[in-house]
From Swiss-Prot:
The keyword GTP-binding is assigned to this record: no
Gene from which the chain derives: queA
Stored InterPro entries: QueA, QueA_dom1, QueA_dom2, QueA_sf
This protein's record includes keyword Cytoplasm: yes
GO biological process, one term: queuosine biosynthetic process
Subunit text: Monomer.
Keywords assigned: Cytoplasm, Queuosine biosynthesis, S-adenosyl-L-methionine, Transferase
Name of the protein described by the UniProt record: S-adenosylmethionine:tRNA ribosyltransferase-isomerase
UniProt enzyme class: transferase
Length: 405
């Protein structure tokens, strides 16, 4: 199989087989809540990417205990071994936030979630569009540029309602809904316009608009310009600069890439009391065959695979479930993933996880709890708060060993 011919995932596939759900009936979302002093939310980046602190949650195989160690991020190469493999997410963040007015005059804010073609829409969405031909001119829509979007407005958009965004530089019309997203059709190509007129969609807890610094620092240093499709950064990767990358290479630590285009759902809290009832958001992911081969070889050599962030973890563990059946080697894969990783999940690929500190009640906090145990994460977060670590996207990092069974 080649990189251009990855295995694909049916969007309706279930990706829950690695949970021991036979013994899980109820997991309270309130068990993943915690209090965080406001001053520990990092709303701006440090002057140097690798100047962040690093909390190492080291698994002690001798006594099955976990040890917390305070480090600097620049010390990361010292915590890994020659022959280990680091896997990055090479996506790039779009300037996906737009401001403007509805054609009736009301203010509106639009966040582009995903660019699509009409052929990408499901049959129900297409039926809605075509059945409203008195409102929507399909001959015109076929020539437009389509996106799935989050919309904030005082009153909900109506079918066929026009939009004027970015001081008139972008215009479009609402042609349908897909669950909580609006289907908008724009008059001009979307990506070039976003680069010119859009605003980088920094997280809502920054409580500010993006500035020139964010245009650089809310992107990774190794992003692929051709993979401009995320609405949030793979934040664990924001700590890496050329200095750290050079140290890793000098020690003989390998690097490889996957792609996951991060959606706005990454910031969404779990709203169901029983987290087992939570519906996970969908994101496009790709594991190249070359990266799969490196992972297989790394494990064959007795070395470790280090996922840089929860996005990489979700790609690797989804691909493992889809391709590495019956103890077969991991293979290249591409498709949409809705994988929800919570305690009880059995990891098949990732040996260490580098990640930031996550929001209360978030699916990402549940993921790291599954990886290093809930008790260890609770203790580590308490230590981080007492030690005044910086939290969330521009905050400090954690390096987690996989839990000791």
């Amino acid at each position: 199989m080649t990189d251009s011919e990855p295995q694909t995932l049916n969007n309706n596939s279930e990706i829950t087989a690695s949970h021991n759900d036979d013994i899980l009936e109820y997991l309270s979302v309130d068990d993943y809540d915690y209090e965080l002093p406001d001053q520990l939310i990092a709303r701006y980046p440090l002057a140097q990417r690798s100047a962040s602190k690093l909390l190492y949650l080291r698994a002690n195989n001798a006594n099955s205990q976990v040890e917390v160690e305070d480090k600097l991020f620049s010390e990361l190469p010292e915590l890994l071994n020659a022959g280990d493999l680091i896997v990055f997410n090479d996506t790039k963040v779009m300037k996906a936030r737009l401001f403007g007015q509805k054609d009736t005059g009301g203010k509106i804010e639009v966040l582009i979630e995903r660019l699509v073609a009409l052929s990408d829409l499901n049959s129900a969405d297409l039926d809605t569009i075509t059945s409203n031909s008195d409102i929507i001119d399909m001959t015109v829509i076929a020539e437009k540029h389509i996106a799935l979007c989050h919309v904030k407005a005082s009153k909900a958009l109506k079918l066929g309602q026009g939009l004027v965004l970015a001081d008139g530089h972008m215009t479009g019309v609402m042609i349908g809904r897909q669950e909580n997203l609006f289907i908008l059709a724009f008059d001009t190509p979307i990506l070039p316009d976003l680069e010119l007129y859009g605003e980088l969609p920094i997280p809502p807890y920054f409580e500010r608009h993006a500035d020139a610094t964010d245009n650089t620092r809310y992107q990774t240093v190794f992003h692929d310009p051709a993979k401009l499709a995320s609405v949030a950064a793979p934040t664990a990767s924001l700590h890496f600069d050329d200095i750290v990358l050079e140290k890793l290479a000098a020690k003989g630590i390998q690097t490889a890439f996957v792609t996951l285009h991060v959606g706005a759902g990454t910031f969404a809290p779990v709203k169901t009391e029983n987290l087992l009832n939570h519906t996970m958001h969908s994101e496009y992911a790709h594991l190249p065959q070359a990266t799969a081969d490196l992972i297989n070889q790394t494990h064959a050599n007795g070395k470790q695979v280090i996922a840089i962030g929860t996005t990489v973890t979700r790609v690797l563990e989804t691909a493992y479930q889809q391709t590495a059946v019956d103890r077969q080697p991991l293979s290249g894969w591409a498709g949409d993933t809705e994988i929800f990783i919570y305690p009880g999940f059995e990891f098949g690929v990732v040996d260490k996880l580098l990640t930031n500190f996550h929001l209360p009640k978030s699916t990402l906090l549940m993921l790291v709890s599954a990886f290093a145990t809930k008790k260890s994460i609770e203790e580590a977060y308490q230590h981080a708060i007492e030690s005044e670590y910086r939290f969330f996207s521009y905050g400090d990092a954690m390096l987690l060993d996989k839990k000791v069974d």
